[in-house]
Amino acid sequence: MIKLIVGLGNPGAEYAATRHNAGFWLVDQLARMGNVTLRNETRFHGYAARANLWGNEVWLLQPQTFMNRSGLATVALARFYKVMPDEILVVHDELDLPPGTVKLKLGGGSGGHNGLKDIAAHLTTQQFWRLRLGIGHPRNLLPPGTAASGQHDVANFVLKAPRKEEQDLIDRAIDQSLDALPELIAGNAEKAMMRLHTAH
């Protein structure tokens, strides 16, 4: 059962449309569906709201600490409302999946994602759920002849807006996620994975 959904991203208008903010986009959709407004909650270092989604009360959170401090906000809200790590779903951009692909998993490493790394450090466990929204990798998406091998290029890539065709695919993956989330929130993880991983 999921009691807290954390969308990862960076605060500020200049980052709103960037690939690294894909987690924010999904949480924005959930807030609209739940007819709630995310409000600045200083004690939780982010924008938060309690929503009734598919008959379940769920907290929505967008940390406003910048990506590499996401754990601060996540743990502040989780501790206050006594949410266990395996009741948390973190929604984040995933370089290792192409745009349009979305995967759900419990636990595992951070895959170089600083937001996940910080959340795991603050929770002192990696046993929380992750919804991985594919944004692609610069080596696969940039035009031929464009250098995109170093860490610097990846950092630039995630802080830029997707091209239109990529954005359309990411939006479709978010829609697929919304189809599977009722099962996960209700505690039917296997059904949620089946629905998500067999969606076309």
From Swiss-Prot:
Residue positions binding tRNA: Y15, F66, N68, N114
Active-site residues (renumbered): H20 (proton acceptor)
Disulphide bridges, residue numbers: none
GO cellular component, as recorded: cytoplasm
Primary location group: cytoplasm
GO biological process, one term: rescue of stalled ribosome
Top-rank EC class of the record's enzyme: hydrolase
Subunit text: Monomer.
Family: Belongs to the PTH family.
Protein name stated in the entry: Peptidyl-tRNA hydrolase
Organism expressing this protein natively: Ralstonia pickettii (strain 12J)
Gene name for this UniProt entry: pth
